[in-house]
C-alpha cells in the first residue's frame, strides 16, 4: 500500500490476521483481540494466524476489513474519506467480490471515489509496455494474462491454482520427511523464509539432481529462530520446480511455462509474435533466481522454431502490480 506517484510502496506487510490462542491474564496490558500483518508475524508464537485472501480472492471479509483499517490508520496514517482509492483484483475475480470490495470502501471507510484494476494489467504498465503476456504469480494463485494495446483478452486468461503458498507447503513436507517438524501456522512462516532466502530454479532439473547427489556445491545452511542450524541441499531447487512440474505435489495441472504457452495459443494468430516477444514476469513467486532463463528455455521448446522469445523479469517485479497502480492513479486522465 502507498500513495499514487510514489515509486515504491510505503507499507508492505503480509495479509495475515492473528488472534490470541489464550485469554490474557495480565489486566491492563492492553492486549488486542486481533493483530494484523507484521505485528501478527512477530507475535505468531501465541496467535492463530488466518489468511483472509485465498487463491487471490477474499474469503473472509471481516478480517479483510481489519487489514484495510490497519493499512489506512496505522501504516499510511491517512483518513480514507479524504482520498480516492485504487484497489486491485485477481483476473477473473467474481463480480460479487468486486461489489463487496466497493461496498466496504464506500460504506465502512467513506472513500470519495474508487477504482478496481486487474493486477496483471498494472504489472505490464509498470514494465512500460502496452502489449505482452504477464505471468503473475503471488501467494495464492498464478495467472497468465495476454494484453494487447492495453486491453486484457479475457478469453485467453488462464488461472493456475499453484503459487507461493503451495511451494511453502511442499517445502514443509520435504523438511518433515527429513525429520524436522514444521506444522503450526507460525512454523510455516519460518519455512517461507527458508524458501525466499535459499530456493532457486534449476535450468536443467535432472542434471541438477545428479550434481547434488555427488557434490556439495548446492548445500547451504539455515539458522532457525532457536539457534538450531539445518542443512538445506537439493530442496533448494526441488521446492520451486513444482512451478514447472505440478505433478510433483500431485496436482493435475500444466506448469507455468505450459500455461503461458496455452494462453498465447488462445489468442489470435496475428498477435502471438508480440506476446512471445514480451513475456513479463510479476509477483513474489517469480523472484526465484534462474526463473527467467528456465522459462525462456521451456517456452522456446514449445513455440515454433523461428519464433523470437523474450522473457522479461524486472528487478522490482515483486511490487510491479503496485508500481503500475501508482503510475495509473497519478495520470490526470485517470483521475477524471
From Swiss-Prot:
It comes from the Eukaryota. GO terms for cellular component: actin cytoskeleton; cytoplasm. The keyword DNA damage does not apply. It is found in: Cytoplasm, Cytoskeleton. The keyword ATP-binding applies. It is an enzyme of class 3 (hydrolase). Its EC number is 3.6.4.-. CDD domains: ASKHA_NBD_actin (cd10224). It catalyses: ATP + H2O = ADP + phosphate + H(+). InterPro entries: Actin (IPR004000), Actin/actin-like_CS (IPR020902), Actin_CS (IPR004001), ATPase_NBD (IPR043129). GO terms for molecular function: ATP binding; hydrolase activity. There are at least 5 different actin genes in tomato. Actins are highly conserved proteins that are involved in various types of cell motility and are ubiquitously expressed in all eukaryotic cells. Essential component of cell cytoskeleton; plays an important role in cytoplasmic streaming, cell shape determination, cell division, organelle movement and extension growth. Belongs to the actin family. This is Actin-41. It comes from Solanum lycopersicum (Tomato).
